């Protein structure tokens, strides 16, 4: 598992983010404070405070993880 910070602070970004991660069969969780939601759930994402970067837990390893990180690099923040 790897954790990165992502910024998905607009409706269009949320829709594109969900489309991007739904291409993979791995589990993705968004963590905001004490809330953990399935990152593939567009309704769940909209229940979070999107004005701040959110932790994304990626449950993949090896070459698969590298591919996922490349796809999600447009959302990643420091």
Language-model-detected regions and their locations in the chain:
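Short glycine-/aliphatic-rich beta-strand segments at the starts of folded cytosolic domains
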Residues: 1-7
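Amphipathic alpha-helical interaction surfaces in cytosolic regulatory modules
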Residues: 11-27, 35-50, 64
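C-terminal structural segments of small proteins and small subunits
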Residues: 49-78
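N-terminal intrinsically disordered, cationic/polar leader segments
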Residues: 4, 18, 22-24, 29, ...
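Short, well-ordered coil↔helix boundary/capping segments
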Residues: 8-11, 59
